Amino acid sequence: MAKKSHQENNDNLIAQNKKARHDYFVTDTVEAGLVLTGTEIKSVRAHRVNLKDGFAQVRNGEAWLMNVHISEYDNGTYFNQDPLRNRKLLLHKKEINKLVGALQDKGVTLIPLKMYIKHGYAKVLLGLAKGKHQYDKREAIKRREQNREIERVMKHY
């Protein structure tokens, strides 16, 4: 039996940052592991994650995921952590150095696009992104509307 690709199996998708591609031009992506506590991974498996305001930084040769909200586990008692705490990202040194070089450019940031479970481990897909201006967003909306209209007309022929 053929191995399923990541795109075919969306059962493991935990959270997706839908506004990211609307607000940013995403140029490159990289997959990173997450260092989580026991109660945090239980909340992740329960899909209680919000990536909306999250971003990543490289400090002292280590990558950190900031401002990602992982809700407290209901049965966690005193083992629960702060929902917005900084979480370490697991990347190879070469990948971190590549990101440091890319982040030197003005206006480039690192944002989480998706969080998913892969082989039992929580992973986050990070995107190197540059912010869009308002007129870029309007242009994208116009282009999308034109394509929808063309598809609607072509459907009848």
From Swiss-Prot:
BP terms from Gene Ontology: trans-translation
Compartments it resides in: Cytoplasm
The keyword RNA-binding is assigned to this record: yes
UniProt GO MF annotations: RNA binding
Taxonomic classification: Bacteria, Bacillati, Bacillota, Bacilli, Lactobacillales
Pfam families named in the record: SmpB
Cellular component terms (Gene Ontology): cytosol
Protein family per UniProt: Belongs to the SmpB family.
Physiological role: Required for rescue of stalled ribosomes mediated by trans-translation. Binds to transfer-messenger RNA (tmRNA), required for stable association of tmRNA with ribosomes. tmRNA and SmpB together mimic tRNA shape, replacing the anticodon stem-loop with SmpB. tmRNA is encoded by the ssrA gene; the 2 termini fold to resemble tRNA(Ala) and it encodes a 'tag peptide', a short internal open reading frame. During trans-translation Ala-aminoacylated tmRNA acts like a tRNA, entering the A-site of stalled ribosomes, displacing the stalled mRNA.
Keyword entries, A-Z: Cytoplasm, RNA-binding
Name of the gene this protein is made from: smpB
Alphabetized InterPro entries for the sequence: SmpB, SsrA-bd_prot, SsrA-bd_prot_CS
Keyword RNA-binding: yes
HAMAP family (UniProt xref): SmpB
Annotated protein name in UniProt: SsrA-binding protein
